[in-house]
From Swiss-Prot:
Official protein name in the record: Major capsid protein
GO cellular component: viral capsid
Protein purpose: Assembles to form an icosahedral capsid.
Keyword Iron (UniProt): no
Length: 336
């Protein structure tokens, strides 16, 4: 391992977080102050275009009321007897954070490759680690099912409960597990399917939102890659497109609009999932005072260990502003 580069990285980390260099070199973890924790969270958020569009917030406690939760009704009006006021909707669940520990070991050989860049070493190494954390945040956000004491699932589904799971538990009426036509499944595509196409599905999900949200112009249709691929193939087959025309269709934004909403396939979104909400209705909360960092050289494992510990959780701010389908119950045209 390039020791000079390692010392330079440790020195940069110590300086950035105002920590004693000898403590960092010993591999001791250290707590971040709230502004430092917020800056780290912002840096991670910048690694993903999708994360940039949702809320990533530092909070003071591990449990509490949602910061951007729903009101009981619209907030505007008038009263002859006093001021017009709307209350927070206390029927909606609050938030609860869980211990979250992100760690990665960078083999000495890989670190030496980073060291070649010298003046950009700290920047590139930080980007490498933060990119991994950002991808994991999205993986858990879409696929998280539980909070295990000791996590074992390769898909990270036992690290925390993500947005889809929270919607299922906290507003079951907005989480479709079967259609009215069939039992135990949701069929998509084809004349006899519950939904002939994605436009029908998107419109139906939109109609499931609380009435006051249905005509918002910031709604988005989140849709999995398998559903988009199937829709594309059906369009190509229906119109008998030539290879050149298919290529043109592929370059055209098929994801433009469904049900009158812009469509997005977020990173790590389940392939057969679909949901309607606004991006600002999705949040990741981190307890500011819980954040800890560490960097150490592990001789036994022949690599550098970087760790980022915090209390973290996911929040659907307004449950009435989100609907979704259970992707495990989806059957495509021709499947039994």
């Amino acid at each position: 391992m390039n020791k000079q580069a390692y010392y330079a990285l440790a020195a940069a980390l110590a300086k950035h977080f105002n920590q004693p260099l000898d403590s960092v070199l010993r591999g001791e973890s250290f707590a971040l102050k709230a502004p430092e924790a917020a800056l780290l969270g912002e840096n991670i958020q910048q690694r993903s275009d999708f994360l940039k569009q949702i809320n990533m917030i530092q909070v003071a406690h591990t449990k509490g009321q949602k910061l951007f939760g729903a009101t009981e009704k619209g907030v505007t009006g008038r009263k002859q007897t006093g001021r017009n006021l709307a209350n927070l909707d206390h029927t909606q669940n609050g938030f609860e954070l869980a211990e979250t520990d992100s760690g990665i070991i960078v083999p000495w050989a890989l670190f030496d490759s980073f060291a070649i860049f010298k003046d950009r070493l700290v920047e590139l190494y930080s980007e490498y680690f933060q990119n991994q954390v950002a991808l994991d945040i999205l993986q858990i956000g879409w696929n998280g099912q539980s909070v295990a004491d000791n996590t074992t699932k390769a898909d990270l589904s036992d690290v925390n409960k993500g947005w889809l799971k929270l919607l299922q538990e906290q507003r079951a009426a907005n989480f479709m597990t079967e259609s009215t036509k069939s039992s135990g499944k949701i069929t998509i595509f084809g004349d006899n399917a519950d939904y002939a196409n994605l436009d029908d599905l998107a419109f139906d999900l939109k109609q499931g939102l609380d009435f006051r949200h249905q005509n918002r112009n910031d709604l988005v249709f989140l849709v999995g890659a398998d559903l988009v691929s199937k829709e594309t193939k059906l369009i190509q087959q229906k119109h008998g497109l030539t290879p050149t025309e298919k290529a043109a269709l592929g370059s055209h934004n098929l994801m433009g609009s469904f049900g009158g909403m812009n469509a997005i396939t977020p990173p790590n979104f389940p392939a057969r999932a679909a949901a309607v909400t606004t991006l600002k209705n999705l949040s990741v909360y981190t307890e500011a005072e819980s954040v800890r960092r560490s960097l150490r050289n592990d001789e036994d494992k022949k690599g550098l260990v970087t760790s980022y510990y915090r209390q973290e959780g996911y929040v659907v701010e307004d449950l009435g502003l989100m609907t979704a389908i259970d992707h495990t119950k989806v059957k495509l045209n021709g499947e039994v």
